[in-house]
Amino acid sequence: MNAATCNTTQEDSDSNQTSDITVNTVTEKGAWCWFADPRAVSHENESGTIKNSYIGYIDVQGNIKATQIDHLRNRMDEVLIRSWFQPDDHNNPTFLVLPDDRVMIFYSRHTDEPCFYYRISRKPGDITTLGKEIRLETADNTTYPSPFILSDDPDHIYLCWRGIGWHPTIARLTMPDKEDKVNFDWGPYQIVQSQKGGRGVRPYAKYMSNGKDRIYLAYTTTHPDNQSVNYIYFNYIDINTHELKDIKGQKLAEVGNGILHNVEATADYKNSYPVAVAEDSPYRNWLWEISVTDEKRPVIAVVRISEDKNSHEYYQVRWTGTEWRKTFLSHAGGHFHQTPDLEKCYSGGMAIDKADPSIIYGSVPVEGKHGSVYELKKFAVTPEGTLASTEQLTYNSHKNNIRPFVISNEGANPQMVWMNGDYYDWIVSSARPGYSTAIRTNMDIPSDEIDIDKGLLHQNPGGTASSVDLKVIDIPQSDKFTIHATIAVDHDAYYGEIIKTDAFVYGLKGGEQPKPYIKAGDNEMTSSNVLGNSDAWKTQNRGTGGHWHAPVKPESFQLTITYEDGVLRIYIDGLVDQYAEAEGLSLSQVVPGGFKGTMQNIRIYNRALSQGEIKTLWQLHDSTITSQ
């Protein structure tokens, strides 16, 4: 019997690492930027039936993915939100829990396409049941979606992003209708203007709401590469009046009336709007996160970057009620990644504790057993603004721990996630391989009991089926089942029925964007995901030119189809791809083939395998759609 417990920790891949916190692995392939948020959320509904965490990321093959951790049922699922996307870490997904507990996921390309994409779970709290992908058109290119719902206007979604003129932008959306469609019913509008909208000016903004009537934002004059003195400003939008105000409530502008408030990194601007400027030190300042957990004392996590960009320093910037107070936290080295003279303003990263904004987590270089490696530290600041304590959390890591993010707090323990590994660039190109990082967490990871022999009705590990070799496989009739196989579809005939059974048909639709489908009875459901990846970007010049390079067809992929409790679930290379409700199915006959290609390693079970078991089968064989 092949039985085991599946629970991957960082120590499995980095056996010499020790830490003061638990270090587990969410995924070995994932990354994010730090301006599209929330990149992860935790949600518990009022009735107590949902208590989930959702963590989103993108891999170097352009797969936008998310992990769902069900803390009540001790279950973890990894979902393929979108395949064949621009392989760029700016494109990580962001999450919004709707009033009916369904989860809405936004994503967009990096500033070279005028639209957003989104998908909504069909079941409350469960992103393994995502509906179809919907495109939301905009007039201007988009990046960094940050969605909110506020109690003063519970019937709308407020979406903030970098949009019009590369500036902070806001719009109000209708709630999803029965077809999951939303529309803009106010905006999009540019929120503010920097340096009169001059060429190349692009403020970087972080947003947070009070959950009621305000969306707070802190933003820079521009990218810190562009000028050596880069101010950081702090405002809020009153959603009832649409007014942009400073921290004391002074009106700066009315969003949407055509007159923009213009900011400048100058003494004249600060003299005119003294409390709107949160940081004016003579550095290439950048920001990582804001907190309005205490609305009267908002906090900004700031990094000061030297003129030559070689020295980074972390600060807590906090409003005291009368002024913005700066507290030094730590020297933070220089740029964290492996590529010299590129993105030298990329610090290891900071995150503010969700429950206690006096605590900030930072990634800083530390000398250890493996040389200078970025480790996580915890900084605590007193109410008076002095650094009370510094605590190192990870030790002797082989690879850098970077871009931390705190999801929520369970008692005194934050749910934290971060990237770990080598990083070369924010985009995959012929010049560099991108961001070959993993996602780690201090949360406990649910474990599946793995037994890939239990319930096995048929196995043909060395056998091959093809379009001319349609051999019927008869099995004892079962109303629960799993079919698993390694599939290789001829690239010149990339279509056809792949598996035909007495319960359903699974196939691949041809065309420039080939997508799988499953048909049970009269109901046919086509996947939102192309059966292909974005490896074509590896041959292209670095940049964001708006191109959709043709999907690269895998040499083979692992297909798993499970059925239980009236639900078909389809997994591609171990990731949830499709969810289809189909009552009353029963399996007794399987016909592999019906396409030009081969099928190997066929396994049929009389039960629905867990995703942990499916990933165990996937790891037994090589695959190229979602792995390197």
Name each model feature, range by range.
Residues I450-P461, L575, N601-Q628:
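Extended recognition patches within non-cytosolic domains
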Residues V576-Q600:
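Flexible glycan-contacting loops in extracellular carbohydrate-active proteins
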Residues K519-Q558:
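Short, aromatic/His-centered strand-loop micro-motif at the edge of beta-sheets
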Residues R82-S83, P93, V277, L470-D474, ...:
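Beta-strand-rich interaction surfaces with strong enrichment in secreted/lumenal proteins
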Residues E555-R569:
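Localized edge beta-strand/strand-to-loop motifs within extracellular or lumenal beta-rich domains
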Residues D14-I450:
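Extracellular, repeat-based ectodomains that mediate carbohydrate processing or recognition
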Residues D225-Y231, R569-Y571, V591-M599, Q611:
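Extracellular carbohydrate recognition
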